[in-house]
């Protein structure tokens, strides 16, 4: 019997994907609050949630945002963004058009349809002007006048060769940031609380992006019925500052 027993060492190997600096900067610019898409005008139903008492403070805002991100449009938009990126990379113009039609059809109300289509068209037009490339011009020619926002972002990133996972993560974080910004204007929540909520939700965005950047369209689905109904009621809300 040997005096020294053989030992087996198990090493946990992890693959780290790094986004090139120029691509990271491009995503930061595209999804910046200063990008001319009009994101400041939309609250995605948050204004009604405040009006009816669903969002009353930082805790209820955090819960509301987490639900929208993980069970509502946040999750679906990340899937659609990834699908548009994949179709653009493959040169599948027909597939991209179908993804766009589906994305527009998923908007449950007139206001949420306007929110995604107006921002999508504005994003595509601005990106074509500032970051032109033949692949993106081809995409723009093939799509309808109405372009869903996540489809526009995914297609632009695919046309420019920006990594899909990074694109989906950046889109998801921008989705949450825009809603936190809206909350600061309409909910009893201050900047410190808003920043804390954003920090708490960032790991969830990263986890969703990791899980969804390769997901197919069959993964689409939502469970935010109260928000969807609220988007209808917002249309006739007596006093409001947002378009959704």
From Swiss-Prot:
Main location: cytoplasm
InterPro entries the UniProt entry points to: UreF, UreF_sf
GO molecular function: nickel cation binding
Quaternary structure and interacting proteins, as annotated: UreD, UreF and UreG form a complex that acts as a GTP-hydrolysis-dependent molecular chaperone, activating the urease apoprotein by helping to assemble the nickel containing metallocenter of UreC. The UreE protein probably delivers the nickel.
PANTHER family: UREASE ACCESSORY PROTEIN F (PTHR33620:SF1)
Function: Required for maturation of urease via the functional incorporation of the urease nickel metallocenter.
Name assigned to this protein: Urease accessory protein UreF
The organism of origin for this protein: Methylorubrum extorquens (strain PA1)
């Amino acid at each position: 019997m040997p005096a020294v027993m053989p030992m087996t060492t198990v090493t946990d190997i992890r693959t780290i994907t790094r986004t090139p600096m120029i691509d990271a900067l491009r995503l930061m610019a595209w999804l910046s609050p200063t990008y001319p898409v009009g994101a400041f005008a939309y609250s995605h139903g948050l204004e009604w949630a405040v009006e009816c008492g669903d969002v009353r403070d930082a805790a209820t805002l955090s819960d509301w945002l987490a639900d929208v991100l993980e069970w509502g449009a946040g999750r679906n938009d990340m899937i659609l963004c990834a699908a548009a990126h994949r179709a653009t990379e493959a040169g599948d113009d027909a597939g991209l058009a179908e993804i766009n039609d589906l994305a527009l059809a998923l908007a449950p109300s007139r206001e949420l349809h306007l929110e995604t289509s107006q921002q999508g068209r504005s994003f595509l037009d601005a990106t074509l002007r500032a970051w032109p490339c033949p692949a993106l011009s081809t995409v723009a020619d093939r799509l309808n006048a109405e372009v869903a926002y996540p489809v526009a972002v995914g297609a632009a990133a695919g046309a420019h060769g920006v990594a899909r996972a990074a694109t989906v993560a950046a889109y998801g974080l921008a989705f949450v940031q825009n809603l936190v910004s809206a909350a600061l204007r309409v909910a009893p929540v201050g900047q410190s609380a808003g920043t804390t909520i954003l920090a708490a939700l960032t790991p969830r965005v990263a986890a969703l992006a990791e899980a969804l950047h390769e997901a197919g369209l069959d993964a689409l689905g939502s469970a935010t019925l109260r928000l969807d109904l609220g988007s209808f009621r917002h249309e006739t809300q007596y006093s409001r500052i947002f378009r959704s």
